[in-house]
Amino acid sequence: MITAPSWRVAVAGSHRHVFANPLGHVFEIGCFAAAPGCAAVGSPTSDFSWFPGTLWQVAVCVACGLHLGWRYVQTDGGTFFGLILDRLHQTPENLA
């Protein structure tokens, strides 16, 4: 399990966001308080952060290494994940 619907959170007023990176790749992401199926890779950076005042790291699947999104660290020390929605699949056990 990557994450669960119960861990959805609103960041900057919404759970869902659409952003483009500096190369023009567009991502629809959802924000989650937890994503135990993700591992953060690399050092946190503020470069091109989509959420002002946050640092980010790439988040990959712990099982296969697929890029699933980003882990964000807020100035108050809190964290959340911005996960690429079309890379997440719901299974019966996480629909409850």
PLM segments and residue spans:
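A short Gly-Trp-Pro
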Residues: M1-A96
